[in-house]
Amino acid sequence: METSKIERFVFETQDDWKGFRKGLFTSSQMNRLMASPTKKEIELGERLSKGAKTYILELISNVEAEPKKEFYSSAMEWGNEQEPQAVLRLAEMLGKDVTDNDFIYTSIGGFVFFVYDKKSGGTPDVILSDAIVEIKCPDSHTHRYYRTFVNSDNISVELPDYYDQMQHNMMLCQKDTCLFMSFDPRYKEAKKQVHLIEVKADKIRQEQILEKIELAHEQKEAWLLL
């Protein structure tokens, strides 16, 4: 990803942030672009999967139509509520303070958003001097699964959607490392409340992501003319 094509924006309100990003492919949805076409689709010359095309159409409708009302499940609300506490725990674990210059919590002081070539964008939860951080606050049983089965070696297979999210954000922030943090304060033992995994930049996957972004952008621009 060319550094000269990366832009950083800070929005005062969440509505401004949402409005700006609604026509862009985002890190959190990147895995939808990465799905491989079926054998039949490939035989027909298709390079984007049905799921990827559905995502493209969703972005187009976000631009051309009135936005639909957002729905927040209890799990999503829980995650949003616990994230600040997770950030504080992370800072403590790293010997940092949330006000340190090399510990940037991207939801404080405005909504940060990185954009690549006006085509895709994303924001990690925390930016460190040498890494970014992606924080998840899942249900307790999911957190336990992560702690038991997910590690640096298999996260690309176990959590492919988060893996692609992190790879895209690493490119946007020009970092070679991402810390994946799962946090659940409901566990009685403090050490069981946190699961931290170091994920390295996967240059091959990152190139594949960039290729899919270009393909999807071309398709989106063509469909916008219809």
Report each predicted region and the residues it spans.
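Acidic-basic catalytic patches of nuclease active cores, encompassing PD-(D/E)XK
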Residues: 76-100
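Charged, glycine-rich intrinsically disordered N-terminal tails and low-complexity linkers that flank
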Residues: 1-81, 85, 151-156
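Short intrinsically disordered terminal tails
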Residues: 1, 225-226
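Generic secondary-structure transition motif, activating predominantly at the C-termini of alpha-helices
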Residues: 14, 21, 25, 60, ...
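Nucleic-acid nuclease catalytic cores
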Residues: 94-217, 221
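Detector for methionine-enriched segments
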Residues: 1, 30, 34, 76, ...
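Alpha-helical structural motif
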Residues: 52-56, 82, 86, 165, ...
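A generic signature of intrinsically disordered, low-complexity regions enriched in glycine/proline
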Residues: 20, 35, 45, 87, ...
